[in-house]
């Protein structure tokens, strides 16, 4: 049985892993689903001052408090930025890194910077305009959630996702990732899981980049961006087998 830490994406919270975590626990795995500062049940802590570093520390703190090691660490979407930083800070404790339809950053990358790399210029401009535009319009420094329909989330789940998602600090997308701990060298396996049922997706870029790369394995699930919501049993089976 494995120690599995599931890290959500932007504007979501630990709530989004509900069904996936339930299936994994039923199979005997230890599962943690930390929520980032400022979203989910921690939305009352929301602030434009929250950064990527804040969220990295959130997850590091969870792992240290739960005294977990030999971890399968899975990050969804923006969570790919977070788990990369977490693995860097915890040398020897993360066994497998899973990028679930997620960004795969290198040192110095920001999420918004990666959009320019992963998407056609006009599509990247639309995403960036939405993120920066809503933060500016609200005079709060907070981005509004993208509607679930844009990610092709199953109609039965869209209202639940839209109801639960909240605004998130733009700074989390603008701050570059700073790697300093050397922990990534100790990760034994990296898995990329592409959600192959929606577009325009920046994540096809990463799946193509790492398919066949040494130390990587690429899987595809035919569904929306929110795999953990729409295909929890399939995702749990994949994670539980790692």
Describe these PLM feature segments:
Residues 2-43:
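Conserved HGGG/HGGXW glycine-rich cap/lid loop of the alpha/beta-hydrolase fold
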Residues 30, 36-72, 88-89, 112-116:
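Active-site loop/oxyanion-hole signature of alpha/beta-hydrolase fold enzymes
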Residues 73-75, 100:
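Short beta-strand immediately N-terminal to the catalytic nucleophile in serine-hydrolase-like folds
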Residues 75-79, 83:
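Gly/Ala-rich beta-loop-alpha elbow adjacent to hydrolase catalytic centers
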Residues 93-94, 98-135, 139, 172-173, ...:
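Flexible "cap/lid" loop of the alpha/beta hydrolase fold
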Residues 163-182, 198:
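Active-site nucleophile elbow and catalytic-triad environment of alpha/beta-hydrolase enzymes
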Residues 192-194:
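Short beta-strand/loop motif that positions the catalytic acidic residue
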Residues 196-229, 242:
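Conserved loop-alpha-helix segment in the C-terminal half of the alpha/beta-hydrolase fold
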């Amino acid at each position: 049985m494995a120690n599995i830490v599931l890290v959500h994406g932007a504007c979501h919270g630990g709530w989004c892993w509900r069904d996936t975590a339930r299936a994994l626990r039923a199979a005997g795995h230890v599962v943690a689903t930390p929520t980032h500062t400022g979203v989910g049940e921690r939305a009352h802590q929301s602030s434009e001052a929250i950064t990527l570093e804040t969220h990295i520390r959130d997850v590091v703190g969870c792992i240290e408090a739960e005294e977990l090691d030999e971890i399968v660490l899975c990050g969804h979407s923006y969570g790919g930025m977070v788990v990369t930083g977490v693995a860097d800070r915890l040398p020897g404790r993360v066994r497998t890194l899973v990028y679930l339809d997620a960004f795969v950053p290198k040192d110095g990358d920001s999420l918004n910077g990666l959009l320019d790399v992963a998407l056609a210029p006009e599509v990247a401009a639309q995403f960036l305009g939405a993120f920066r535009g809503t933060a500016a319009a609200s005079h709060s420094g907070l981005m509004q959630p993208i509607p679930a329909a844009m990610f092709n989330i199953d109609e039965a789940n869209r209202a639940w996702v839209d109801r639960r998602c909240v605004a998130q600090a733009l700074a989390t997308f603008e701050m570059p990732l700073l790697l300093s701990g050397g922990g990534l060298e100790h990760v034994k396996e990296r898995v990329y899981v592409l959600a192959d049922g929606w577009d325009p997706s920046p994540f096809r870029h990463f799946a193509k980049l790492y398919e066949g790369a040494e130390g990587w394995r690429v899987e595809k699930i035919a569904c929306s961006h929110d795999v953990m919501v729409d295909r929890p049993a399939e995702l749990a089976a994949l994670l539980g087998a790692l």
